[in-house]
From Swiss-Prot:
Protein name: Fe/S biogenesis protein NfuA
Species lineage: Bacteria, Pseudomonadati, Pseudomonadota, Gammaproteobacteria, Pseudomonadales
Superkingdom: Bacteria
Residues the entry annotates as binding [4Fe-4S] cluster: 152, 155
Native source organism of the sequence: Stutzerimonas stutzeri (strain A1501)
One GO BP: iron-sulfur cluster assembly
Summary of the function given for this chain in its UniProt record: Involved in iron-sulfur cluster biogenesis. Binds a 4Fe-4S cluster, can transfer this cluster to apoproteins, and thereby intervenes in the maturation of Fe/S proteins. Could also act as a scaffold/chaperone for damaged Fe/S proteins.
Gene name for this UniProt entry: nfuA
Keyword 4Fe-4S annotated: yes
SUPFAM superfamilies: Fe-S cluster assembly (FSCA) domain-like, HesB-like domain
Length: 194
């Protein structure tokens, strides 16, 4: 059972497109570029027989096979592919609510959990100042190495944000995390919020 739903309207639209390719056995491949990041993009491409990847998951549909990229599959949880007609013809839409931020649990690796909380709890607040923070690495038995960007780089309040906001939030959510360290070059104050 796949985590992706392809509506009947989308299936019929895609089946029609595939039939026009004049390639026996052609299907589609669904994947995400840069999954789990703010830059994630969900994509559908033609997939001729033999073009599927070894870790792809086959989703057999009525008229064709949809190949789901194995790496992207967890990020495609609750994804919906739909087709809606309009005055201009119609539009294929892909909604993948977990593409940018994967759902994690306490068994997920620490770096995935840190990234999850950075994207869902920390960065939305920093975005109001035009900033963000990124996980660089987890070192020394549980120290998260972070880097500020945008309006946070060079900001005079970065230390307070790091210790009072980010570190407290992450320590409350991830008990085995021991602390955080900032590796940002704050001498560049060109875009700093404060």
């Amino acid at each position: 059972m796949s985590a992706i739903t392809i509506t009947e309207a989308a299936h019929d639209y895609l089946a029609d497109l595939l039939a026009k390719q004049n390639t026996t056995g052609i299907g589609i491949r669904i994947f995400i570029t840069q999954p789990g990041t703010p830059y994630a993009e969900t994509c559908i491409a033609y997939c001729k027989p033999g073009e599927e990847k070894p870790d792809d998951i086959a989703l057999a549909l009525k008229s064709f096979t949809a190949w789901i990229d194995g790496t992207s599959e967890p990020f495609l949880e609750d994804a919906l592919v739909d087709y809606a007609t309009d005055r201009m013809g119609g539009q294929l839409t892909i909604k993948a609510p977990n593409a940018k931020v994967p759902m994690v649990n306490e068994d997920s690796p620490m770096n995935e959990r840190i990234n999850y909380y950075l994207q869902t709890e920390i960065n939305p607040g920093l975005a109001s100042h035009g900033g963000q923070v990124t996980l660089i690495d987890v070192v020394e038995e549980g120290i998260a190495v972070l880097q500020f960007g945008g309006g946070c780089q060079g900001c005079g309040q970065a230390d307070v944000t790091l210790k009072e906001g980010i570190e407290k939030t992450l320590l409350a959510r991830i008990p085995e995390l021991k602390g955080v360290r900032d590796v940002t070059d704050h001498t560049n104050r060109e875009n700093a919020y404060y």
